[in-house]
From Swiss-Prot:
This is Trigger factor. The keyword Repeat does not apply. It catalyses: [protein]-peptidylproline (omega=180) = [protein]-peptidylproline (omega=0). Belongs to the FKBP-type PPIase family. Tig subfamily. NCBIfam families: tig. Its main location: cytoplasm. Its EC number is 5.2.1.8. It comes from Haemophilus influenzae (strain PittEE). PANTHER family: TRIGGER FACTOR CHAPERONE AND PEPTIDYL-PROLYL CIS/TRANS ISOMERASE, TRIGGER FACTOR-LIKE PROTEIN TIG, CHLOROPLASTIC. The lineage of its organism: Bacteria, Pseudomonadati, Pseudomonadota, Gammaproteobacteria, Pasteurellales.
Length: 432
């Protein structure tokens, strides 16, 4: 077998392969022998069909089967011998496949880029340091109390944290518009559900009042006919309710688990959960900075075939999240996922090189610690640990996460890392 490799464009390669006629002829003869033993033709016993009838009836399909076997086998023999790291599936083009002649074909395929890491010392990472305060825990307790709140009707004016029931009719230039009318609409004030100015226009009014609110729809509003338009809403304020928070008693805290018997227990449990969430958020924030730095310092081309595979993965994930079926998934435009898919492939290649160049292997003790951390969020942590330890697929997933964390650590060891004091809210609610 002779081999000729050429670069067509970017990461695309074309390999011209010649398979000697002796190998082709032998493969055809052996396939005919197998067929002769198994084919059934009326009028002949199995295994006794004459060769010329087999040729007439099955010759073309037998040769196609031989071709289907020879192409990938000799292609992969060739790329393995040349140590070519292929991406995706090759496409074959037959140049010669005739009796008594060499089989000549070409395979077009993509390769993964050769990655040589550089500029790690130029990567800048800001590593937040955070201390969870008693005030942070107080805020979390307030959230829990609001989740358990009741509502009491009020004759006072509307305040920012009230709940109101209203009728409204919206109009633009004196004309009502579609979707701008509602009856007995319940609105939780302060949540920003309505367009700017709507909630603000209700604050300070009393139940039973009728009044107008002047607002302007945002330029990016979803309805084309309302973008940037000035509108008037006629409001009838039917009911105002104040939020009544439950008292912070032992009876209240008992709702949050069998081990939570006092306010002190609740605060301890909240701190533990906040610490776990904070740890994950900090790891994620640092990792994203490392990824951004790696990509910036090491721009690489990625195989289109690998990007397409990742696009399909993202499509399927989107379908699962939103309850779509396979047909709907296929209709989602690739442009929605292309940038993220490309980035994922880049990150995978760069991390693979970090792992390879640093000769990293998953730290089993670190994997056990990660499982213990996951298990601590459950009421029966020992059962969770045992479940993971007996499931090889889950264990491998954990090892992969650990290996990725070790790769991040390897980059951080060479990067420019600075620490910045931050608050819990700044890390957990960066958009707030």
């Amino acid at each position: 077998m002779s081999l000729n490799i050429e670069t067509t464009q970017g990461l695309e390669r074309r390999v011209a392969i010649t398979v000697p006629t002796e190998i082709v002829s032998k493969a055809v003869r052996e396939e005919f022998k197998r067929a002769a033993k198994n084919v059934r033709v009326d009028g002949f016993r199995k295994g006794h069909v004459p060769a010329h009838i087999i040729e007439q009836r099955f010759g073309a399909s037998i040769r196609q089967d031989v071709l289907n076997d020879l192409l990938p086998r000799h292609f992969f023999d060739a790329v393995i011998a040349e140590k070519i790291n292929i991406a995706g599936r090759p496409t074959f083009a037959i140049e010669t496949f005739e009796e008594g002649k060499d089989l000549v074909f070409t395979a077009t395929f993509e390769v993964y880029p050769e990655v040589k890491l550089q500029g790690l010392e130029n990567i800048k990472v800001e590593k937040p340091t955070v201390e969870i305060t008693e005030a942070d825990i107080d805020k979390m307790i307030d959230v829990l109390r609001k989740q358990q709140a009741t509502w009491a009707e009020s004759q006072d004016v509307v305040k920012a944290d009230d709940r109101v029931t209203i009728d409204f009719v919206g109009s633009v230039d004196g004309e009502e518009f579609e979707g701008g009318k509602a009856t007995d609409f319940v609105l939780f004030m302060g949540q920003g559900r309505m367009i700017p100015g709507f909630e603000e226009g209700i604050i300070g009014h009393k139940a039973g009042e009728q009044f107008d609110i002047d607002v302007t729809f945002p330029a990016e509003y979803h309805a084309e006919n309302l973008k940037g338009k000035a509108a008037k809403f006629a409001i009838t304020l039917k009911k105002i309710e104040n939020m009544v928070l439950p008292e912070l008693t032992d009876e209240f805290v008992a709702k949050f688990g069998p081990n939570t018997k006092s306010v002190a227990d609740l605060r301890a449990e909240i701190r533990k959960n906040m610490e776990r969430e904070l740890k994950n958020a900090l790891v994620s924030r640092v990792k994203q900075q490392v990824i951004n730095g790696l990509i910036e310092q090491n721009p690489i081309d990625v195989p289109a075939s690998a990007v397409e595979e990742e696009i399909n993965v993202l499509r399927n994930q989107a379908a699962q999240r939103f309850g779509g079926n396979a047909q709907q998934t296929a209709q989602l435009p690739r442009e929605l996922f292309e940038a993220e898919a490309t980035r994922r492939v880049q990150v995978g290649l760069l991390f693979s090189e970090v792992i390879k160049s640093n000769e990293l292997k998953a730290d089993e003790e670190r994997a056990k610690a990660m499982i213990a951390d996951i298990a601590s969020a459950y009421e029966q942590p020992a059962e969770v640990v045992e479940y993971y330890s007996k499931n090889e697929e889950l264990m491998n997933n954990i090892r992969n996460v650990v290996l990725e964390e070790q790769a991040v650590d390897a980059v951080l060891a060479k990067a420019q890392v600075t620490e910045k004091v931050s608050s819990f809210d700044e890390i957990m609610n960066p958009q707030a």
